[in-house]
């Protein structure tokens, strides 16, 4: 009894399998190929490619799947990306349903030219093509219920408008817009087959400069002047990998900036070495900047990498200007200031010497209503006048104080400016009288050497010694005010500290 029931159940469940096997065998059987041919001919006979399925009825629902093979290139210059994919569309066309053969019919790709297919296009497409090796990569598969599966292998270059303000620390959203070109939502509808699983292969993609962080599937309708159209969007979120730029741009810029600071340790009088180093680093930074601009589009705003390279260029250029300042102070401004200070001190000392000499050798005296200028030496050490001066006192008298009164003074030999009593070129050294008739000169009892040559020489020697001391002091103190070594020492600290602060602010701002 049990065996009979068991055999009965087995016969019921195995019947469809037997029918399918028989049908498959009949289809593959060359003698039954005529049945398949008749079925296809019947489907295509009288088929009007000009009319959509269910014309005049509800809109055709077209489901789409995408299997991404690769993303070949993302170009910042052209603002686009290249995508290779297997693009599949499925819809139901009752005119293509059949029940004679319970199997799917995969037909030659040329049959697609005889069937109605959706007028799908990529809205942001720049250039696309269907692969044709070894034959045109198209597939048509018919199901018994009239479902049509239409597959293509396509490579498309789609526009992707990028915001490069944070380049190369940026994230970009690139989309693929799929839309019907002629049919409105009254005739056709688009949807993603399998919902979130409609797009596959994203996780397997590896890009040299980007990582795919996420992707989204969007279904919407857009309205134009000609009507409302269905649209599907596939949006990729791409994050740029910074490793390449650290090795190719950031690290060379940092090292070149640090290299420019080596000039602070080179002696300030080594002009050739410091100037050559500064100019080399400036030109290298310019080359890096130029190469980077060639790989990016000409956009009106400043990018993150532009800010960094501009900062490095400023530091390199300032290092070169630092030596220009040092060179000017050491070889230009410093000696000029020393020379001016020395001249000013010498003029002040000469003026003071004149005043001291006048006070020492001339004394105004007024006696008996007559004003005299007396030549005297407070030290008491008098010396005879220079031999180059020859006086002839033709008339003289003695006053009660034993001073010689000269009524006539004849100077036989004119005194040169350089042969004056003080050697200062003062014309007053030859004028001994306030009035035209008499001069009080010296006491008669004093010897001829009372004109003080030794005292004058000692006084001049003291002034010269004092001037030398002041000049030596100037020579020591002036470089302290503009010390080139101090500028280099401060630069060794200032430049690295400010550059480190610049890097901290830059990376905190752009990374976060």
UniProtKB/Swiss-Prot annotation:
What CDD domains does the database record attribute to this sequence?
Answer: LGIC_ECD_GABAAR_B (cd18999), LGIC_TM_GABAAR_beta (cd19053)
Its placement in the membrane is given as: Multi-pass membrane protein
Position of the signal peptide: 1-25
One GO MF term on file is: GABA-gated chloride ion channel activity
Intrachain disulfide bonds: 160-174
| Catalytic reaction annotation | chloride(in) = chloride(out)
Q: Which residues carry this modification: Phosphotyrosine?
A: 441
Supply the alphabetized keyword list: Cell membrane, Chloride, Chloride channel, Cytoplasmic vesicle, Disulfide bond, Glycoprotein, Ion channel, Ion transport, Ligand-gated ion channel, Membrane, Phosphoprotein, Postsynaptic cell membrane, Receptor, Signal, Synapse, Transmembrane, Transmembrane helix, Transport
Gene Ontology BP annotations = cellular response to histamine; chloride transmembrane transport; cochlea development; gamma-aminobutyric acid signaling pathway; inhibitory synapse assembly; inner ear receptor cell development; innervation; neuron development
Compartment(s) where it occurs, according to its Swiss-Prot or TrEMBL record: Postsynaptic cell membrane; Cell membrane; Cytoplasmic vesicle
Explain the post-translational modification.
Glycosylated.
- Which stretches are Cytoplasmic in the membrane topology? 327-489
What are the TM regions of this chain, as residue ranges?
245-266, 270-292, 304-326, 490-511
Q: Glycosylation positions? A: 32, 104, 173
Query: What does its activity-regulation comment describe?
Result: Allosterically activated by benzodiazepines and the anesthetic etomidate. Inhibited by the antagonist bicuculline. Potentiated by histamine.
Which residues of this UniProt protein bind histamine? 121, 180-181, 226
Extracellular topological domain: 26-244
Query: Listed GO cellular component terms?
Result: chloride channel complex; cytoplasmic vesicle; dendritic spine; GABA-A receptor complex; GABA-ergic synapse; plasma membrane; postsynaptic specialization membrane
Q: What is known of its domains?
A: The extracellular domain contributes to synaptic contact formation.
How it assembles, according to the record, is: Heteropentamer, formed by a combination of alpha (GABRA1-6), beta (GABRB1-3), gamma (GABRG1-3), delta (GABRD), epsilon (GABRE), rho (GABRR1-3), pi (GABRP) and theta (GABRQ) chains, each subunit exhibiting distinct physiological and pharmacological properties. Interacts with UBQLN1. May interact with KIF21B. Identified in a complex of 720 kDa composed of LHFPL4, NLGN2, GABRA1, GABRB2, GABRG2 and GABRB3.
Functional description taken from the UniProt entry: Beta subunit of the heteropentameric ligand-gated chloride channel gated by gamma-aminobutyric acid (GABA), a major inhibitory neurotransmitter in the brain. GABA-gated chloride channels, also named GABA(A) receptors (GABAAR), consist of five subunits arranged around a central pore and contain GABA active binding site(s) located at the alpha and beta subunit interface(s). When activated by GABA, GABAARs selectively allow the flow of chloride anions across the cell membrane down their electrochemical gradient.
Query: What's the protein here called?
Result: Gamma-aminobutyric acid receptor subunit beta-2
What organism is the protein native to?
A: Mus musculus
Q: Which gene encodes it?
A: Gabrb2
